[in-house]
Amino acid sequence: MVLSSSPQGETAYLDADLKDTDEILAGAARLLDLSQPVGVMLVAVLHMLRDEEDPQAVVDRLMAAVPAGSFLVISHLASDIQQEAMAEMGRRLNQAMTQQFTMRSHAQVTAFFDGLTLVDPGVVLTHQWRPDDEAGAATPGVLWAGAARKD
């Protein structure tokens, strides 16, 4: 709960379908000046879209609507690490939940950043994204993560 704030610290909640980018952008425009660079954060959500729902088009529409200097951040369940364990986890999640998960490979997640400039260290497992200490670097990750700038 925010007890007091300034316009710069304002927050909002938008309940929208990720595929409805027009609604998402309209909601964002009520709070943000979309003529200025912004951060588009698709953290642990794109794996909720099946391939036939065209997650690349969702990313492309969101990034087309924001100006140069904006950033895109993505984290996504990995399909190509610990493959047997991840496949089993995916089966269990998909049995337990009404929303199905689609895990994607490093190459597939990297493709979401096409046309943008990746920030170092690129698309890596979350535990490899600028770890603060050796313990963090040693913890195995199950998500690909990356950030990129729109030039």
Segments predicted by a language model, with ranges:
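Alpha-helical subdomain
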Residues: 1-151
